[in-house]
Amino acid sequence: HLTLQKGKTWCELSAKNNYFFFLLEGALIVDFNECVGYEVGKGEMIYLPRSADFKIFAKESADLIILSYGIPVQLCDKLSLSQLGAFITDFKYEFKSLDIRVPLDTFLKLLVKYLDSGMSCQHMHELKQKELFLILRAYYTKEEKVNFFYHSIAASLTFKDKVMGVYLEARTVQELADKCGYGLKTFQRLFYSCFSE
């Protein structure tokens, strides 16, 4: 839970995580990759994938919740991001926010209460991540989710294509990582993220 004062710029994200920004009050101007000057208002959310090139500017004082994750907690096949990959073909991506709708607004109000009272442990964060993905699955359309998570879905598909194209030529994990153009640790992290679903 964070307050960003009017006129302040924020860009302190880790390249290892994906981020949800939920704007409870105020207005932000977001520069994200090719999209410059996108305005996010009260009651909207945006998603920034790991290693995103971005800048966030507070047009008005902003009250926001920032949730981050490295690899999404696995729920079930119907909730995995990779399942949305089937809908990405011939899809026209446009960076845009999503409205925070019922029951996501209630989820966020309760989350603020938890955080403001100092309740912040790994178990609570994992539970809330699961709950968030359940809400997104049930209350947002496939088209909205594909557009919202487009960069993560596309990156996952690209990695998967690389692996599937060369895996028969590799005898070890290190060889497979080399053939795909990654260091071993990065390859293992991406592999787990892509294929653990």
Task: Describe the predicted segments one by one.
Residues 1-89:
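N-terminal regulatory/effector-sensing and dimerization cores
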Residues 138, 170, 174-197:
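Basic/polar phosphate-binding segments, predominantly the helix-turn-helix DNA-binding elements
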Residues 101-113, 126-129, 145-171, 175-180:
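A short, Lys/Arg-enriched amphipathic alpha-helix from helix-turn-helix/homeodomain DNA-binding modules
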